[in-house]
Structures are given as structure tokens and as C-alpha cells.
Design a protein with these regions (language model features):
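Residues forming the flavin
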Residues: 1-254
Length: 254
């Protein structure tokens, strides 16, 4: 009931990704515990609405921090990959918060800042030099509550000393994970997964959309962490491969 059978000659799997759940593996971030601990996605919604506030009281924050690599580059939870876009998005959102709230101090706690392409110049340095966003290399180990603020605790790895920073708003830069749709398509079409749980591409670096199943191609974050440009490029390549496969099949039939 509600199902429809469709006969097709080729398939492009473009099932995207899902965001890491920062409360799924550990409560060190206090995501389900403290209202003022949110994610990049939550922040993007507020920025689009033109109203960045603390969820706990509806007031504009005076101190905000981003915590990078939440659910990425983490062997303890098994996510041993860089999600590729989090650093750039955090810098973009940091700039937008400073534009919206000029008196708000913004911090970014990071392991390494990984900026791809022109983001290094257009976003990263712009955030530091023009908008005075504070970048602190360190490891966050715990988020607690003190009064009406959340307190970020960890280590400043550059200075080699303990870190404790009271914040009004903590933003978690959550990484990418294989989506449920990717897992379902893998089972449905018997597509092998690579070691991280994404659909395996067998075409090498010059042909990243080919899978182990003839006529089935993969695009975007279904094959691994990807930004918008990667996804669009792979989508176009997969569509061309699918069209070529269909044409080849029709020529054989003729």
C-alpha cells in the first residue's frame, strides 16, 4: 500500500548526509541539558530570521563561542573523517553574528581550522581581521552551568594551560554522517559501503561516481563528506554517466 514500482535503466543515489547528534554519544557538550547549547543548524535558522538570541531567556548574547569538530575527526565515536564544511560555516556565522550584534564577543575553539579554496581569504582572515573573531586552539572537555551562563572547560593547547570560559551561547559545529537514506539505498541495491559507512565509489579519483553495481551511480555526500560545489559537480557527472549507460544499453538492444 502506498508503494509504486518503477522500471528504470539507471539510478543516481544522492541521499545526502545527516548531522551528527551531539547528545547521542556523550553528554560532555550538554546539548540536551542546557538550552543555550545549540548547533550550526540552529544558528543558521536564527540568522535567517534576523534574530540571534539565547534560547533560555530570549535575550541577545554578549559572549558566543563555536566549538569545532563535534562528531568529526573523533576516534572515540568512530567518526574518523573531516566533514569539510564546518570550519567555513562557523566562520561565516561568526561574521554574521558580529554584523548583527556588534557588541557581542565571538570565539572559535578549534583543533585545526581547515578552509578549502577561497574560504581562507574570503571568510577565515576576514573573520579575524575585520570582525575581530577570537580563534583559540584548544580541546573542549566539558560544558557546565554556572548561574545563567554555560561554562566551556578544556585546554588551551597553544598556551598549554587549562581553559575555562563563561558563555551566553555555545554553538556546536556538528559534522556529517551517512544518512539513513544512504544506508537504505545500500541495502536495496546491494551497494558496498566504504569503511566509514558511505557508498563506495570504485572509479578512482578521476571517476568518483561509479559504484560496484552497473547502472547505479552515486553523487554528493552519499559518497562521503562534500560541500555544495562538490555535490553539484558530482551530480552533473553522475547524470552524464547515467545517460551514457542508458544510451549504451539502448544501442546493444538495437
Amino acid at each position: 500500500k502506498g508503494e509504486e514500482k518503477v522500471d528504470v535503466g539507471s539510478i543516481v543515489v544522492a541521499t545526502g548526509f545527516q548531522h551528527f547528534d551531539p547528545g547521542k554519544e556523550t553528554q560532555m557538550y550538554g546539548y540536551y541539558e542546557f538550552d543555550d547549547v545549540i548547533t550550526l543548524v540552529d544558528t543558521e535558522r536564527m540568522l535567517k530570521a534576523g534574530n540571534v538570541v539565547r534560547p533560555s531567556n530570549g535575550e541577545a548574547p554578549k559572549q558566543v563561542c563555536f566549538i569545532q569538530c563535534v562528531g568529526s575527526r573523533d576516534r572515540q565515536i568512530g567518526n574518523q573523517w573531516c566533514s569539510k564544511v564546518c570550519c567555513g560555516i562557523a566562520c561565516k556565522e561568526a561574521i554574521e553574528i558580529r554584523q548583527m550584534l556588534p557588541e557581542c564577543r565571538v570565539f572559535v575553539f578549534y583543533i585545526d581550522m581547515r578552509m578549502y579554496g577561497f574560504w581562507e581569504d574570503e571568510i577565515y582572515w576576514k573573520a579575524q581581521e575585520e570582525y575581530k573573531v577570537n580563534f583559540i586552539r584548544g580541546i573542549v572537555t566539558e560544558i557546565t552551568k554556572r548561574g545563567d551562563q554555560v561554562v566551556v572547560k578544556g585546554e588551551d593547547t597553544t598556551m598549554g594551560r587549562p581553559l575555562e570560559a563563561p558563555m551566553d551561547l555555545v554553538i556546536l559545529s556538528v559534522g556529517m554522517e551517512p544518512s539513513e537514506g544512504t544506508t537504505q539505498m545500500s541495502k536495496l541495491f546491494q551497494l558496498p559501503l566504504e569503511s566509514h559507512g558511505y557508498i563506495e565509489s570504485i572509479g578512482g579519483a578521476l571517476n568518483t561516481v561509479v559504484t560496484a553495481v552497473p547502472g547505479v551511480f552515486v553523487a554528493g555526500a552519499a559518497a562521503g563528506p562534500a560541500d555544495l560545489e562538490d555535490s553539484v559537480s558530482m551530480g552533473g557527472a553522475a547524470a552524464m554517466k547515467a545517460a551514457a549507460y542508458l544510451r549504451k544499453a539502448s544501442l546493444k538492444a538495437a
